[in-house]
Amino acid sequence: SIKSFQQKYGSEVMPSEDKIDAEVYYNKHDIFTKLYWMYMLASVVMFIFVIIRIFKENRFLKTMVGICGVAVLILFGLHTLGLIWRWYISGHAPWSNAYESILYVGWATMFFGLAFGRKSSLTIASTAFVAGFILWGASMNWLNPAISNLQPVLDSYWLMIHVAVIVASYGPFTLGMILGLVSLLLILLTNDKNKKRMDLNIRELTIINEMALTVGLVMLTIGNFLGGQWANESWG
């Protein structure tokens, strides 16, 4: 049979039964296509409750914001699990092509949103929406989601270092972009009655925005230097 022939002459490159089962399960559940609308739904609901809470504080709104925050955290855990899953199946870091890079940018955006805005509901809601939008872009039919072999030029430990750092830097930059837009929205919604509370939220978002852009710039700079080292090592 074909399987026996493959095992006889190509056993060194054939995936194990566990990896085959893992890939079948991964393709069957299509986790990233489901994640994008879940991210967006959780973020929109959370954002609505957060905005209402700015104008009217009560226990119900606080509870709902907390529930939405936990939901976003669970979705991020599934996002992380999906990337680890692809890593296990392919045997290499899951940012080796356009599709995987977009998944990784979405993950990095959500990671930095949770890291910098863990006490800011507006930041978490805004970041979750952008992460969902990024995953939606990855689900479009112009990108091939297939798990393929690594291109020879990428078969290097620099894939783990350079690409991981420089692509992850897009995460805090994206976070800064959405926080800037949300800050402008809050400015438009500011009036005499809510000015004090709005100013606090805008100041909070501005501080987080500055931290995100600073981290993004540092990561992008380091990533460029690492890329130069990779090029020197590969081509001289």
Residue ranges and their predicted role:
Residues S1-G236:
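Polytopic transmembrane helical bundles with strong interfacial aromatic enrichment
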